[in-house]
């Protein structure tokens, strides 16, 4: 009988063989490290561009908010650091809080209208035939793709006091008092037109997203609900709504951000008038900073606007997460 015993390594070459090939193992580890770093290297250009285009303006705005920077200091290239004086002046004034409440109400009304109208159109798209769905989606995409300034200009023409189409139609329908009505003459009428404009531009995004969400719902679930005797409303609440809920959360979150900072529509339509009664926070920051040449004050208002928006979104996300935990 022959007994074979394992011979211990006798030299460096045997040690390298026992370690798994020496150079081959080192190359494998190096390749593994390179593979782990590859995603970060690919993300580096995008991250650098984000920091350059978004991070630096935020830092610059934050620095300006601690300075007394008016036209005199700007011409003389003088930097006057004032600490939190700009924030104290803004927070102790009535205008900021009045504009803040107005901005929150304005955002809430527009978001609710946008989500309701967009949700109904999205559900309608799911039930239309192919041709009608295609035509409606073309119209939605065209409305969504129109530049904001161009859309605002069109609405200025539509609601013009003397030659506007809206006043002409209302006059022909019997409302003769509207023939020469000024839509920019009061706070309510101005906000009404701006709200119609914002909802008109925001609905396509909501409708198309919700329609896309309905295409992910299996038909078997509706068939099972019908076999259980569920009607249209029960099928919607038991089958459709649970699938749409994540899309509704995400879409609402985005709409809150976009509408809260709707500067172009409000400022282009009437410049925050009449008598600055339709100013929301972005318009208020621009008028104080650029219009009145109080650049430090405008920067402080902009920083506070960002903080308020972060607070609103954090509160909304907290509600969403709590609802998801309750469902689990």
Curated annotation (Swiss-Prot):
Pfam family, any one: BPD_transp_1
Residue ranges occupied by any ABC transmembrane type-1 domain in the UniProt entry: 100-316
Keywords noted in UniProt: Cell membrane, Membrane, Sugar transport, Transmembrane, Transmembrane helix, Transport
GO cellular component, one term: plasma membrane
The protein's name in its UniProt record: Diacetylchitobiose uptake system permease protein DasB
Induction: Induced by (GlcNAc)2 and (GlcNAc)3.
Subunit structure comment from the entry: The complex is composed of two ATP-binding proteins (MsiK), two transmembrane proteins (DasB and DasC) and a solute-binding protein (DasA).
Region Disordered: start-end pairs: 1-27
Annotated function: Part of the ABC transporter complex DasABC-MsiK involved in N,N'-diacetylchitobiose ((GlcNAc)2) uptake. Responsible for the translocation of the substrate across the membrane.
Organism: Streptomyces coelicolor (strain ATCC BAA-471 / A3(2) / M145)
Family: Belongs to the binding-protein-dependent transport system permease family.
Signal peptide coordinates: none
Residue ranges of the TM segments: 36-56, 104-124, 134-154, 188-208, 247-267, 297-317
GO biological process, one term: transmembrane transport
Lineage, highest ranks first: Bacteria, Bacillati, Actinomycetota, Actinomycetes, Kitasatosporales
PROSITE patterns reported in the protein's UniProt record: ABC_TM1
Domain of life: Bacteria
Topology class, membrane: Multi-pass membrane protein
């Amino acid at each position: 009988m022959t007994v074979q015993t394992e011979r211990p390594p006798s030299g460096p070459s045997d040690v390298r063989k026992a370690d798994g090939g020496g150079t081959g193992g080192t190359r494998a580890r190096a390749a593994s490290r390179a593979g782990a770093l590859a995603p970060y290297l690919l993300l580096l250009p995008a991250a650098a561009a984000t920091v350059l285009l978004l991070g630096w303006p935020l830092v610059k705005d934050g620095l300006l908010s601690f300075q007394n920077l008016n036209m005199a200091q700007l011409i003389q290239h003088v930097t006057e650091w004032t600490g939190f004086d700009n924030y104290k002046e803004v927070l102790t004034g009535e205008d900021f809080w009045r504009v803040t409440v107005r901005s929150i109400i304005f955002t809430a009304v527009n978001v609710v209208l946008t989500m309701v109208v967009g949700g109904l159109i999205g559900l309608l798209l799911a039930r239309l035939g192919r041709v009608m769905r295609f035509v409606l989606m073309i119209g939605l995409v065209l409305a969504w793709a129109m530049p904001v300034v161009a859309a605002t200009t069109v609405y200025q023409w539509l609601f013009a006091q003397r030659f506007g189409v809206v006043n002409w139609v209302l006059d022909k329908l019997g409302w003769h008092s509207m023939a020469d009505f000024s839509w920019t003459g009061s706070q309510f009428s101005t906000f009404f037109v701006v709200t119609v404009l914002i909802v008109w531009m925001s609905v396509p995004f909501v409708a198309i997203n919700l329609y896309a969400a309905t295409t992910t719902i299996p038909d078997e679930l509706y068939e099972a609900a019908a076999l259980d005797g569920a009607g249209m409303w029960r099928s919607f609440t038991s089958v459709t709504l649970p699938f749409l809920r994540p899309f509704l959360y995400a879409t609402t979150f985005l709409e809150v951000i976009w509408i809260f900072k709707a500067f172009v529509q409000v400022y282009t339509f009437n410049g925050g008038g009449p008598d600055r009664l339709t100013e929301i926070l972005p318009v208020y920051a621009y008028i104080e900073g650029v219009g009145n040449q109080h650049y430090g004050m405008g920067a402080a208002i902009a920083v506070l606007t960002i903080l308020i928006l972060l607070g609103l979104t954090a509160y909304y996300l907290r509600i969403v997460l709590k609802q998801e935990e309750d469902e689990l």
